[in-house]
């Protein structure tokens, strides 16, 4: 016998799900121009850019972008946000952009980075208080020298 499990119609798929509370990076667009990202997809360009850092130069759709890869000094087109991850500044005082959560779209400064936890201390522009933000919610921002 093949272990008669009653496999079947338990998982009914419903269209038009009303669960709006799913806060997953897979679905929420977080791409912005001028933020630093790392390529985490081994298949992207046959692995040539795997774990390489770059800067988003153009956001084409909410989930795809063109990235200038530092090491190769070239632009890779149409990378999906699933293929990328955020990069947090190494040093304190680095410019950051909130890419998710309550403060999405706001710029600020990295004050402290705790290597033992997944949180950083940031001060956003026009905010007096220091905020504790999750690493995935902030990203290094490339500020052009004026």
Question: Language-model features: where?
Answer:
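Intrinsic disorder/low-complexity signal
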Residues: 1-26, 30, 142-146
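Basic/aromatic-rich interaction segments and small domains that mediate binding to polyanionic partners
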Residues: 11-16, 31-78, 94-140, 144
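Short, intrinsically disordered linker segments that flank or connect zinc-binding domains
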Residues: 23-26, 80-87
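Short nucleic-acid-contacting surface segments enriched for D/E, G, S/T with interspersed K/R
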Residues: 89-92
């Amino acid at each position: 016998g093949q272990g008669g499990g009653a496999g079947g119609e338990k998982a009914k798929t419903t269209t038009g799900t009303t669960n709006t509370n799913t806060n997953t990076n897979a679905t929420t667009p977080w791409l912005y121009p001028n933020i630093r990202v790392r390529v985490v997809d081994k298949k992207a360009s046959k692995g040539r850019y795997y774990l390489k850092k770059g800067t988003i130069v153009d956001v084409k759709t909410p989930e795809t972008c063109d990235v200038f890869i530092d090491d190769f000094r070239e632009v890779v087109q149409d990378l999906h946000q699933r293929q990328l991850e955020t990069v947090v500044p190494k040093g304190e005082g680095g410019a950051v952009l909130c890419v998710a959560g309550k403060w999405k779209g706001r710029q600020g400064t990295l004050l402290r980075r705790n290597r033992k936890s997944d949180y950083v201390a940031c001060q956003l522009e026009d905010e007096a208080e220091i905020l504790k933000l999750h690493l995935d919610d902030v990203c290094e921002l490339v500020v052009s020298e004026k």
